[in-house]
């Protein structure tokens, strides 16, 4: 309730059940008899309703050898220095794609660097490649979309894979499977987009006249 400042704000949306009960909540497995239960108990007593429709019970973050982190053992990782060094997005992506939320994760700093290099580095290089040649050719983002039948087969192939990816990721997220969603996105970027599409189309970009491809790459 505090997240939406109820009952001091958002009364109408809350009372009309637009934002309550919550679609899902996420906490550590240790909250099964704590927060998970307390929210339902309060919701039932006050509103005669469950407090949430689904729950994601998070596992524990262990060290890379599978041991519980502890200052005493010297295997704890400082999250603030880690974010400062590697960035928050690589850290998030590493944790999302490493293991399902309900499983324990063996945390390895080297894995964050690998994610930053392989996924984010590849994504950045792909965008930089597109931006370079789109600017050289004077591509206008306001140009109308190119008809499907006028697109080269390889362009239709990557678009088909992208549409399939969107459908699959939506399904994974609806089923509370963020790890499968993240891995599907990583595979698309690293394999299909970078290794196949960009590599096979380099000569087309170098030769100019790439309005068709620029349009769908945006």
Pin down the residues of each PLM region:
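Structured secondary-structure scaffolds
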Residues: 1-136, 158-201, 205-206
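Short amphipathic helix-turn modules centered on a small-residue break
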Residues: 141-143, 193
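The feature captures the catalytic groove of carbohydrate-active enzymes
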Residues: 150-157
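Catalytic palm subdomain of template-directed nucleic-acid polymerases
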Residues: 209
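Conserved small/polar residues in nucleotide/adenosyl-binding loops
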Residues: 215-218
């Amino acid at each position: 309730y505090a997240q939406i400042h109820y009952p001091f704000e958002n009364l109408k949306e809350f009372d009309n059940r637009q934002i309550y009960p919550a679609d899902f909540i996420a906490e550590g497995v240790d909250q099964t008899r704590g927060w998970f239960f307390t929210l339902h108990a309060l919701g039932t007593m006050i509103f005669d309703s469950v407090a949430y429709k689904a729950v994601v019970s998070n596992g524990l973050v262990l060290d890379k050898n599978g041991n519980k982190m502890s200052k005493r053992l010297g295997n704890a990782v400082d999250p603030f220095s880690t974010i400062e060094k590697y960035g928050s997005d690589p850290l998030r992506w590493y944790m999302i794609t490493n293991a399902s939320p309900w499983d324990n994760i063996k945390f390895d700093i080297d894995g964050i660097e690998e994610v930053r290099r392989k996924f984010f580095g590849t994504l950045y290089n792909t965008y930089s490649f597109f931006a370079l040649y789109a600017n050289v050719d004077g591509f206008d983002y306001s140009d109308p979309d190119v008809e499907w039948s006028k697109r080269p087969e390889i362009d239709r192939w990557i678009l088909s894979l992208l549409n399939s990816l969107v459908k699959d990721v939506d399904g994974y997220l609806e089923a509370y499977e963020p790890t499968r969603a993240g891995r599907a996105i990583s595979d698309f970027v690293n394999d299909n987009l970078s290794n196949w599409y960009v590599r096979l189309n380099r000569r087309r970009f170098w030769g100019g006249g790439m309005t068709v491809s620029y349009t769908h790459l945006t």
